[in-house]
């Protein structure tokens, strides 16, 4: 497993190298590109971020991991502050012994939603725009630290 303190650097180096490669290979910006490589890269990001080690380096993640399985699940609770998030967290905490599947789900929501937005707004340059988004806008910190804010 990759040590938590290296995740940020590996992420930024990976995004930079892929961006340079894609920009160098891309000749015609008006051609509508296929979605295949975008989906594969999105799946890679979901797995890379979702299966990260539980570490204080990732901020809020440790709070969610430490409170895992302490809440009991008695069905959907309409009285919670954040109805969807809190109920999913409680349900998954009662089903899975570890918080990792929850982090994978949150990463999937985060990265798939961004990919869909990039595809809708920029159908001919989806991959480049997706890479620019991933390199900018505090993407890594929202995906790992502000779990609720990142998915929202």
Regions found by a protein language model. Name each.
Residues 1-45:
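Start-transfer (signal-anchor) and selected internal transmembrane alpha helices
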Residues 8-16, 66, 106-111, 133, ...:
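Hydrophobic core segments of transmembrane alpha-helices in multi-pass, intramembrane catalytic enzymes
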Residues 17-30, 50-53, 116-122:
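Structural signal for the C-terminal ends of transmembrane alpha-helices
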Residues 33-35, 118-136:
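Transmembrane-helix signature of polytopic, membrane-embedded enzymes
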Residues 35-42, 50-74:
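Extracytoplasmic loop-helix module adjacent to an early transmembrane segment
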Residues 60-97:
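Short hydrophobic/aromatic helix or loop-helix immediately within or flanking a transmembrane segment
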Residues 105-123:
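Transmembrane-helix motifs of polytopic, lipid-linked glycan transferases
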Residues 127-146, 150-151:
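Membrane-embedded helix bundles of polyisoprenyl
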């Amino acid at each position: 497993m990759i040590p938590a303190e290296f995740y940020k650097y590996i992420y930024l180096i990976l995004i930079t190298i892929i961006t340079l490669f894609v920009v160098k290979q891309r000749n015609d910006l008006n051609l509508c590109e296929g979605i295949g490589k975008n989906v594969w890269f999105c799946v890679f990001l979901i797995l890379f971020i979702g299966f990260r080690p539980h570490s204080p380096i990732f901020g809020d993640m440790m709070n969610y991991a430490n409170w895992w399985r302490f809440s009991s699940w008695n069905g959907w609770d309409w009285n919670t502050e954040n109805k969807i998030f809190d109920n999913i967290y409680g349900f998954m905490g009662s089903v899975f012994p570890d918080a990792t599947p929850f982090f994978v789900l949150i990463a999937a929501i985060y990265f798939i939603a961004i990919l869909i937005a990039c595809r809708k707004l920029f159908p001919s340059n989806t991959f480049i725009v997706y890479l620019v988004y991933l390199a900018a806008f505090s993407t890594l910190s929202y995906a790992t630290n502000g779990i609720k804010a990142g998915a929202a």
